[in-house]
Regions:
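Charged, gly/pro-rich active-site loop segments
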Residues: 1, 72-140
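Short, basic/aromatic recognition patches
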Residues: 1-15
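Short secondary-structure boundary/capping segments
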Residues: 7-8, 34, 54, 104-106, ...
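Alpha-helix boundary recognition
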Residues: 10-11, 57-58, 96
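Short beta-strand segments
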Residues: 13-48, 54-56, 62-66, 75-76
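Generic structural signal for secondary-structure transition and capping sites
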Residues: 14-15, 61, 100, 121
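Short, acidic/turn-prone active-site loops that include or flank metal/cofactor-
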Residues: 68-70
């Protein structure tokens, strides 16, 4: 699957499961609303009181699963950053284009935004015979 088709697949899905690692090494997962950049970055919001927030600040490596309808999924591993300044504004614009109803969340106490840059992506479609399983090359 090329990057354009992968982007189109990911954009069709509004939710993903993000997994992070706690301070004691325990994996923790949460369903989050997502937006996807053309560079295949995943943007999501959370609050600083969530478990994922301190996990990602201390250990930015994380993973996502996006999609699952019809056994089509993207497995995604990457590095999370909390953007600020002009970068934050740019990513918020992308996020709110996907989630306009979340724009009022900017006023929530402790709201935070993360951008996860991919380091490894695999697309799988188990509805096909034989299944389609493709890894996508990520350039550094």
């Amino acid at each position: 699957m090329d990057r354009i088709a992968l982007h189109a697949f990911m954009v069709r899905h509004r939710f993903g499961v993000v997994s992070s690692i706690s301070g004691d090494g325990t994996p923790q997962s949460a369903l989050v609303g997502i937006a996807i950049t053309p560079q295949l970055e995943i943007i999501f919001d959370t609050v600083r009181s969530s478990r994922k927030y301190p996990n990602l600040i201390a250990r930015p490596v994380c993973s996502f699963v996006v999609g699952w309808t019809g056994e089509q999924t993207v497995q995604f591993e990457g590095y999370a950053t909390e953007p600020n300044g002009p970068d934050l504004k740019r990513y918020q614009e992308i996020y709110f284009a996907a989630w306009p109803e979340c724009e009022p969340h900017m006023n929530w106490p402790g709201i935070a935004y993360f951008v996860v840059r991919p380091r490894w992506i695999r697309y799988s479609d188990y509805d096909q015979k034989p299944p389609i399983i493709e890894e996508v090359a990520i350039s550094s």
